[in-house]
C-alpha cells in the first residue's frame, strides 16, 4: 500500500524563505528559525511548526538565521548591513553588529560566547558577545561575497564558502588551512559534527567532504539544480531541494533515490533535518516553510497515522495516509 506524505505548511512570511536552522534538543523540545526577504525572521516550535514569535528590527531582507544549541539566543544576518543577536525566549534584541555591506551568514560557537559572520564585503568576522563594544577579529582571503560561514571541529576551525570556493581556516592563527575550488557556484553548505562531514551543493551535485581535511568522501547527481541539502543525523538518508520545486530523498550509502515530493509552488532555497531526525523542513520562493516526515506513517508531532479500517466508514479509499491533525 502507498503511504502518502502530507507536509505541514507553515505560513506567515510574505516573501521568499531563504534560510532556516534548528536548535538542539532542549527540555522544551526543539525550535526552528527562518530567514526571509520580508525582513522578519520567525521562531517556531520545531516538531509542529507552531509560530512562537517574530523578531522585529531589521530594515532589509534577512539572508541568514541561526539559533544557539539550547535555543536561548538567535542571530540574524541582513541586507541592512547588520547582524543582530536576540533573546530567543523574550524576543528582545540584545545587540546590533554593524557591517560595511550586506551580511549573509551567522553562526554561534557551542558555548554561545562568539558569533561568526560573513557577507558581501568578503570578510569573516568573529564577535565576542561578552564584549559587544570591542572590535571584531577579521579574517580576509575570500575573493567574492561570502555565502556561508560555520564553526567546526569544536570551534577550533571555520568553514566558509564564497561563489566557487570553500575554505577551511584555523581559528587560533586566523590563517587558511586548505581550500576547494568548484567550476560552478556553491549554493549551500552544511556541517555535521558527528563524523566531521561537510555537505556542499553546486549545480546538480551534492558532495560530501571531510570537514577536517576537505578530502572528498562521495557525491551524488540530482535531476535538477540543487540549492540545499541536508544529511540525516544517523547518516541513513539525505534530502535535497532546488529549482524544480521538488524535495528528493536519497539513501546515503547507495545514492539511490528513495522518494521525491512536490509540495512547494516555487524553487526550494533551504532544507534541514531536525535534530532528532524525525522530520525535515524546507523553505521556498513561495514564502512558506513545510515540514516533512522522514518516515511517512509514523505518529509524531501533529501527524497521526490513520489506518484504513479507521477511515473505512468515511471513504472507501484504502490508501494509508499520515495526516496532520491541523495545519501550523
Regions found by a protein language model. Give the residues of each.
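Beta-strand-rich domains and repeat architectures in extracellular enzymes and scaffolds
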Residues: 10-39
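WD40/WD-repeat beta-propeller blade N-cap
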Residues: 10-17, 56-62, 97-103, 139-146, ...
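Conserved strand-to-loop turn within each blade of WD40 beta-propeller repeats
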Residues: 35-38, 76-80, 117-121, 160-164, ...
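WD40-repeat beta-propellers
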Residues: 41-45, 83-86, 106, 124-128, ...
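Solenoidal tandem-repeat scaffolds enriched in leucines and small polar residues
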Residues: 102-202
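Terminal intrinsically disordered, low-complexity extensions flanking WD-repeat/beta-propeller proteins
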Residues: 225, 259, 265-267, 275-278, ...
Amino acid at each position: 500500500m502507498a503511504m502518502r506524505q502530507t507536509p505541514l505548511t507553515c505560513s506567515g512570511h510574505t516573501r521568499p524563505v531563504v534560510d532556516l536552522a534548528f536548535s538542539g534538543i532542549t527540555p522544551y523540545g526543539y525550535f526552528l528559525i527562518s530567514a526571509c526577504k520580508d525582513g522578519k525572521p520567525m521562531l517556531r516550535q520545531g516538531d509542529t511548526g507552531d509560530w512562537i514569535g517574530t523578531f522585529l528590527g531589521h530594515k532589509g531582507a534577512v539572508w541568514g538565521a541561526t539559533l544557539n544549541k539550547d535555543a536561548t539566543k538567535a542571530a540574524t544576518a541582513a541586507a541592512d548591513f547588520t547582524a543582530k543577536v536576540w533573546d530567543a525566549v523574550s524576543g528582545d534584541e540584545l545587540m546590533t553588529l554593524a557591517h560595511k555591506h550586506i551580511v549573509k551568514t551567522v553562526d554561534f560557537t557551542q558555548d554561545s560566547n562568539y558569533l561568526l559572520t560573513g557577507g558581501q564585503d568578503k570578510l569573516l568576522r568573529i564577535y565576542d558577545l561578552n564584549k559587544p563594544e570591542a572590535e571584531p577579529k577579521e579574517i580576509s582571503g575570500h575573493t567574492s561575497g561570502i555565502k556561508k560561514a560555520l564553526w567546526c571541529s569544536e570551534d577550533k576551525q571555520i568553514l566558509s564558502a564564497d561563489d566557487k570556493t570553500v575554505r577551511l581556516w584555523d581559528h587560533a592563527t586566523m590563517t587558511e588551512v586548505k581550500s576547494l575550488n568548484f567550476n560552478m557556484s556553491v549554493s549551500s553548505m552544511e556541517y555535521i559534527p558527528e563524523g566531521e562531514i561537510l555537505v556542499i551543493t553546486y549545480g546538480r551535485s551534492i558532495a560530501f567532504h571531510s570537514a577536517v581535511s576537505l578530502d572528498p568522501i562521495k557525491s551524488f547527481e540530482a535531476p535538477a539544480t540543487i540549492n540545499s541539502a541536508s544529511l540525516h543525523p544517523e547518516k541513513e538518508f539525505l534530502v535535497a531541494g532546488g529549482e524544480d520545486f521538488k524535495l528528493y530523498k536519497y539513501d546515503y550509502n547507495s545514492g539511490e533515490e528513495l522518494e521525491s515530493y512536490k509540495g512547494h509552488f516555487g524553487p526550494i532555497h533551504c532544507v534541514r533535518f531536525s535534530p532528532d531526525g524525525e522530520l525535515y523542513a524546507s523553505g521556498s520562493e513561495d514564502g512558506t516553510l513545510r515540514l516533512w516526515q522522514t518516515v511517512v506513517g509514523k505518529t509524531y508531532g501533529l501527524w497521526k497515522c490513520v489506518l484504513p479500517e479507521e477511515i473505512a466508514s468515511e471513504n472507501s479509499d484504502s490508501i494509508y495516509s499520515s495526516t496532520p491533525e491541523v495545519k501550523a
